[in-house]
Amino acid sequence: MLSPLIQSTLLMTLGLGTLVTFSSTSWILAWIGLEINTIAIIPLMAKTHHPRSIEATTKYFIAQSAGSATLLITACLTAWYSGNWAISPSNDPIILNAMTLALMLKLGMAPMHFWLPEVMVGLDFITGMILATWQKLAPITLLIQIAQDQNNMFILIPALLSVFVGGWGGLNQTQTRKILAYSSIAHMGWITSMAPFNPTITWLTTLIYCLITSATFINLHILKANKITALTMNKHNQISQMLLLLLLLSLGGLPPLTGFINKLLASIELANQNLIIYLFMMMMGSLLSLFFYTRMCYLSIILSPPCSTTNLILWRVVSNKPMTLITMLSTNLFIMTPQLLAVFTLH
């Protein structure tokens, strides 16, 4: 295990890498920020000294190295042709497509998604939460910047494929971390489908996704539910189980929970672009994800053993105000949608 000082240093380094990518105006600085992120999370992933953790760390390093190498080569070619390192799409469609694929690989989108479930299953919930949320911010920032000049179909087709792969892949899983990995793949499909049309809404949906996913990971960490069968055996933390029910339904995008904001905004944006058939296919794919969310809810609540006495229930639990706040935001933010849109579209 890592000492608290080293762990805090690594977490601050993670934040530094993302901020470097956010504030960079050149490809070389953006690439350095991505590399700082990768180097900082590797010790966090391997801290348990378990063979599965080491295997997951190795797979993650190989996948990220391939994406970073491709991104650096395409950035060098762009600088060679344009004469500067400024973050701008390349005029060569082959270079632009390779750059987009490299960022999709780092995001874990289909068809470059194979590393994500295998890596996620070897991590603990907190490190998995960082991988599924914070590590997505820097690549999606770069993807949004080049998506405006990219061929729309080159982004929309992987986005649609991610929704179907995320839903289909999670159907036969029993590991909760693998289910959340496929959930992340499906959500990345919805988020990136808006990147060519509306960067502001793309950022809003990304932050909402990070909020709900973080709350779900923390809740499963509290319940120690590594497998979905463990959800039926938890007798003493029924409040967390009830909160998990709401969080899973919010991840599925059911109204009036917070997760419905992402589906609603994406549907409105795609409909405005006259992509009705594409939107219908995205909705059909999201039903697959909703099925395994509902199955987890069924196991968590319906199949839980009855408690005939209140002595088994920990009513006097330690106050956890941050967890309470993040859970409330993850489930009750839908009524604030007009205000969120007003804030994010403010120029």
From Swiss-Prot:
Family, per entry: Belongs to the complex I subunit 2 family.
Function: Core subunit of the mitochondrial membrane respiratory chain NADH dehydrogenase (Complex I) that is believed to belong to the minimal assembly required for catalysis. Complex I functions in the transfer of electrons from NADH to the respiratory chain. The immediate electron acceptor for the enzyme is believed to be ubiquinone.
Gene Ontology molecular-function annotations: NADH dehydrogenase (ubiquinone) activity
Name this polypeptide is given: NADH-ubiquinone oxidoreductase chain 2
EC annotation from Swiss-Prot or TrEMBL: 7.1.1.2
Keyword Mitochondrion: yes
Domain of life: Eukaryota
Compartments in which it is found: Mitochondrion inner membrane
CC terms in the record's Gene Ontology section: mitochondrial inner membrane
Its membrane topology: Multi-pass membrane protein
Gene name per UniProt: MT-ND2
Coiled-coil annotated residue ranges, if any: none
Gene Ontology BP annotations: mitochondrial electron transport, NADH to ubiquinone
Alphabetically ordered keywords of this record: Electron transport, Membrane, Mitochondrion, Mitochondrion inner membrane, NAD, Respiratory chain, Translocase, Transmembrane, Transmembrane helix, Transport, Ubiquinone
Source species of the chain: Petromyzon marinus (Sea lamprey)
